[in-house]
């Protein structure tokens, strides 16, 4: 199985390798006067590949007139008015933008009668053979290792068939489908044998959330509990990952186990932390024998002894710890992560949603405020679709009651709007999207919670900025493309505040992609300011936080802010101000813990790791990486 890494640490999804292979196959088939037969999935990781193929078609360097497409799977059973048909998604994302002939597009029938399902599947297999078999299969991967809709337990001999959708896949599908319609219980899917019959197979995966499963697929033994692992048996299978999705592969995470290394400070730190965890010792107790017995003899040659390497990495980690995230005034900052001057600093904390600031760095925000820095918080999106309908109902009951109590129900706008929204919710179907008025009310609820949290953290309300970036306001899970308008809104705030410190989300495992888009908007605005020669940028540092969906690996941490038990409690209180995001919040992800519990667990785990390595023992720690 061939593994190709593309992109950078900031998850640039370069799909040209896959597009090159497909384009070459199409052109070769055209030269020979043959069809080029493709099995195509609809996973989000394939979007970038489809966009690249569309670009080549639009530039007139590639035609798809000889291409035959077979949809890899379809939901079953579908209602006639269903918006869930995967073939429609495939057309919307790809096929309708190129010149594939309509008569050459085939899909399994999600409407077929149950007693005709087997015949439908058998006919699909025969039709593939009629065209000479599959030339290429282009697929993504689910969290359980499923490919197409082949759930764990699917055998290597399995062919096109009806299969029950597993709970993990269902959760993933519900999160990714751009509709509130209930996912059907089953799928009609190409089998493992069908996919492996393709001459070439491409599997693409992007992002941190795929790192764990990709390590198992590529490096673990073949097993039917991990259907994608059967790709190891294919003579021309290509796994294409970005660095985030490849993060747990041995060659990336522990390269010293497979090759000689170029030993950077970060890699040495990673190796020593791994060694400490493997043998259960703190850094300063590691010996030459420990290094030699665990494949790290190169470091002994580099540093001369275990003692020298231990001291170097211990000091590096020690210097990441600071109780002064804005820099300690009038102090030697040689070994501190932040400079002492200027003091006080102007700080902007960019928060993708209206609670990410306190979830990810609530303790650090309080510390910055207490140490007299000029702290601004910028909430980049409204977060409106993450508010449940019952929250709107509760607030509408309140305002209607307020109208009755103090205005004798004379405010007809409130009365009419109350009745209108009450009627809408009473008739609302699962697949219905909210009206613009309801989305506005939901955004207002989140604004109120954010203001309450900021007041609790002693941030003046004139330092609280609601940017409402336009890309978010689709009313759906899938957002609009980021545009210059989004960037200009962020840039205007930067020009107004002229910060010495900027905090942005580095939590790119957010399953809906909002964090990445928000961070991209900030970095794009900074690039524009750089081009314009902005003076304030010469004395500004950018720090990236995590916490809502993942935590920084210790080899990457450059600043770690310790929290006492009291400070951790205050952080929890800040998060709890966001009441709409507690148990009933729509998008808690596949982690059953509430966000305050996730944050505390991650912060405590970071502190525990520092303690195990022989450094100071704290209740919790918030970690940051500098963006350079």
Annotate each predicted stretch with a short phrase.
Residues 1-7, 12:
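Single conserved hydrophobic/aromatic residue that forms the stacking wall/gate
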Residues 4, 62-136:
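Ligand-binding beta-strand-loop-alpha-helix segment within the catalytic cores
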Residues 40-45, 139-143, 206:
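Glycine-rich beta-strand-to-loop/alpha-helix junction loops that act as flexible
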Residues 49-60, 358-382, 386:
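Histidine-anchored nucleotide/phosphate-binding helix
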Residues 49-55, 147-159, 512-528:
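Short Gly/Thr/Asp-enriched flexible loops that form oxyanion-binding sites at enzyme active sites
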Residues 148-192:
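Class I SAM-dependent methyltransferase SAM-binding "motif I" and its flanking Rossmann-like core
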Residues 172-178, 182-187, 279-348, 367-371, ...:
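Metal-dependent de-N-acetylase/amidase catalytic core
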Residues 190-193, 199-294:
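ATP/nucleoside-binding phosphotransfer catalytic cores, i.e., glycine-rich phosphate-binding loops
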